[in-house]
Amino acid sequence: MILNKKLKLAYCVFLGCYGLSLHSSLAAYREPGQLGSPDSWKNAEFNRQWGLEAISAEFAYARAYTGKGVTIGVIDDAILSHPEFAGKLTRLDNGSYNFSYDKQDNMSFGTHGTHVAGIAAAKRDGSGMHGVAYDADIIGTKLNDYGNRNGREELIQSAARVINNSWGIRPDIRRDAKGDIIWLPNGRPDYVAWVKTDVINEVMRNKSNLEWGSEQPVPTGGHSAMATLLRAAKHGKLIVFSAGNYNNYNIPEAQKSLPYAFPEVLNNYLIVTNLSNNDKLSVSSTSCGHTASFLACQPGSSIYSSVGELVSNTGGAVNREAYNKGELTVKPDYGNMSGTSMAPDVTGFAAVLMQRFPYMSAAQISAVIKTTATDLGEVGIDHLFGWGRVNLRDAINGPKMFITQEDIPQEFYVPGSYSEKQFVVNIPGLGNIVEAGTPVERRCTSGECDFDSWSNDIRGHGGLTKTGAGTLAVLGNNTYSGDTWVKQGVLAYNGSVASNVYIENSGTVAGDRTVGAFRAVRGCEHGDAGNGYGTLHVLLDAVFDRGSQYNVELADKGRSDKLAARRAFLNGGSMNVSLDRSQKLMSQNEAELLVGNNYTILTTLDGVTGRFDNANPSYPFVKVALDYRGNDTGLGITKTDATFDSLASTENDKEVARAVETLNATEPVTETAKRSVSIPASEEANLQQSDAGAAQAVNEEASIVAGHPIYESFLGFTTARELQQATRQLSGQIHADMASAQINESRYLRDTATERLRQADGRRTASDIKADDNGAWAKLLGNWGHASGNDNATGYQTSTYGVLLGLDSELFDDGRLGVMTGYTRTSLVGGLQSVVHSDTTHLGLYGDKRFGALALPAGGTYTWHRIDTSRSVNYGAQADREKARYNARTGQLFIESGYDWSNDVVNLEPFANLAYTHYRNEGINEQGGAAALRGDKQSQSATASTLGLRADTQWQTDSVAIALPGELGWQHQYGKLERKTQLMFKRSDVAFDVNSVPVSRDGAILKAGVDVSINKNVVLSLGYGGQLSSNHQDNSVNAGLTWRF
């Protein structure tokens, strides 16, 4: 019967209250499960459903596989809007619920569908229980829904990838002469046994109708249920079906036997029986019978899950009268049920695997479920347990068998099934579409779509075909006997395989283990598996056809990819040589010289026939030559005529590249390399001997020729961009930057001296200089600067803070003489993670001579710097940190002439000055790795002049006096504009020049301020000063409050 709208409304009202009662506990829920820790997932909510531990679900959760992103379909009675399904349930039926009356008019409410859905995908939220795939979504439709909506067809066209069916047709129950039910000694009804031939014949009789029904939207009535399942399977869904609860002697009925009429959908069909908690078939469960080849077992006895019940709002009876009065409410609850209807353990299991293997089809997921099941009863597939109990711990590690007809016992074989000889796996690459054009079409967005690994040992008579642009790593010891084809992407063998391997198109085989035979057909490659170097061992023949490619990666200490076979047939093809650029060389004083090395990259027992067409390094600085030596093929490495600076485009880059080119001087060292090329002991002894002989001796000690790590790292560059990235970081530009910054910032000393002289002469208030009547003064410095980078040099930022102190006095009536000192700290942040700090002490002498309105200030300063530098070197796999501490000095002389032209409105002073600055360091000696630099004592000078105008004006209001000083000037640099430092690598005597950002020939000087005298004791001041040019911008801001008391 159908529940009416009045009862549904009451349910919704109740559910709202029920949800509110849970809110506080759910909001406080914190997930105790941790990645990598299976036991941490077994909280109280987990343990309430014993089937979760029985199928080892915790191992999937510990690897973050929870069914997320997968949708489960359920065909059953109506699924209640239980809190366990909040935000994840979609119903495709008419929205009603199922209930019935007994002879006394008491109502019974149908919650079978709710219980089933909870087992598959109830939420994990700290309350009640949770399903196997607790992060999956659910789409439900009713088995018997006679409304206007065709929920079954909508389900077929939906995103649901696995559909649960916990229903079936019950056989008759035997009765005695009195018409009473006959009960068996175990307490079960005596069901009439289905007969295999009768069951299969029923399916076959309806085959044409089912075929027709499956090719169009499924109608209602007739054989529509079977047509629904067939159509869904043909649309790429996995059909999970309960076997039935009709005693162990019985077999599944016609709906579950559909693959006998349609063997092409068998791989999308999975029948499930019911286990008790001791791994015995429950006494109520139907056995596998003729469906054993597509059946697995799962926990199904006393399974705790979500349910609902009718309750009275008044506390009265739950019957027809109360229903008619609107006194009944649906209450969400939990309860235990038993039977093969608990099949959704497998349905949720499949959803977890669909997240784990997002690229697999439903048929392949079914194969993983079956072949990783734990065998029960008789060895192999049997009539009670089929493939065995599902095991999620093993299933998340990939298939354990590639199934063909030969792997199925004859008594259980479905004619026409398991006809595919190859397990075709498409690792599509991140973001690509899988199963395009079907209802289950989806975009592959997880990491497994680009790289995945299977660690199970795979057996069976089938083979493997790898397609798609991604990489599949096969880690187990595999004994499957079918062929292996690699047609796209990479198949990496970190385990062994007994079958023959063929690669074609854009396929790649990689690895360091054993295969049976090997043939590269065309456009294919062999290389390492991305985990170091090793030998791919071929027990029989290795064949390279024209158009194929053999990829070999080379490294130091004689390490390289290698192929060892009984025989090799080279029918052409290319050898592509690459260098291992993952080696971290900077921490080494020496690296083995690559150029001049010889590698054995192919070794055989019975000889090499033919030749490769060519050997192709993809590097401008390295070339290779093949050497065929009897049973072996070798590879020699030499340097090309191209120089490193041929890829450089700027002068700094060229200078560094030329210096690196000189680092190739070699010398023998006593270090030895252990060059082990032994084959695993499990291989045939004669092949092992062949490989060892080709290497001259296993664990042979060989003298290594030393090379400079930087030089060796440059050999692998392929583009100008790579070289520029390296030369910029190796150049040590930060030292030239600091020298330039010290010269530029010397202006703050001379500006302060001239401002103080103008202040003392009464020509400017100079509020940022605090002075007393005895000629003592102080000034706080704070400025920041920026140098704009160019193609040759990276930019940098500076900041300087400190204090200057001075004392001066009148000299006769028309002059002044003073002395100044101070401390400042300059910080410079360069490009590429370079930092410099300079602690600086200053000493200076200044004075002026006045001739009426004409003033001639002059002075000199001397500065001592203590410089600390730190810079990073990071390019490719190379990383290092270089540090240095050294001393430097800066001296300067300056002179100025200014004419005071004042009137009642404004004071003007045109001026001109000239300054000479000389910087000298005491030598640079970095500490670090191979990229550390050194430099001799060196100096540089600069001469600059400034022409400008100073102006200030003052006026008095009723309450305050305001002064507005300002300055505008044009600065001109003489001589060379480059600021460079000469450096060299520590193991070299060849110096190179590195330029900082050049100074601008011309620039502007700008100063502006305001002084507000609130009264004779309180003065507020604000000022800005800047030197602005195309390449450098220096700025300072000062603000002050003077309060005399």
UniProtKB/Swiss-Prot annotation:
PROSITE patterns in alphabetical order: AUTOTRANSPORTER (PS51208), SUBTILASE (PS51892), SUBTILASE_HIS (PS00137)
Pro-peptide positions on chain: 646-1045
Domain Autotransporter: 769-1045
BP GO annotations: protein processing
Coarse class of the protein's main subcellular location: secreted
GO cellular component terms, semicolon-separated: extracellular region; outer membrane
N-terminal signal peptide: 1-27
GO molecular function, one term: serine-type endopeptidase activity
Catalytic site positions: D76, H112, S341
InterPro entries: Autotransporte_beta (IPR005546), Autotransporte_beta_dom_sf (IPR036709), Autotrns_rpt (IPR013425), OM_autotransptr_brl_dom (IPR006315), Pectin_lyase_fold/virulence (IPR011050), Peptidase_S8/S53_dom (IPR000209), Peptidase_S8/S53_dom_sf (IPR036852), Peptidase_S8_His-AS (IPR022398)
Compartment(s) where it occurs, according to its Swiss-Prot or TrEMBL record: Secreted
Catalytic class of the enzyme: hydrolase
Cell membrane recorded as keyword: no
Disulfide bonds: none
Domain Peptidase S8 residue range list: 49-396
Keywords per UniProt: Hydrolase, Protease, Secreted, Serine protease, Signal, Zymogen
Keyword Kinase: no
EC number: 3.4.21.-
Superkingdom to which the source organism belongs: Bacteria
Similarity comment: Belongs to the peptidase S8 family.
NCBIfam families for the chain: autotrans_barl, autotrns_rpt
Protein name, entry field: Extracellular serine protease
UniProt organism field: Serratia marcescens
Lineage: Bacteria, Pseudomonadati, Pseudomonadota, Gammaproteobacteria, Enterobacterales
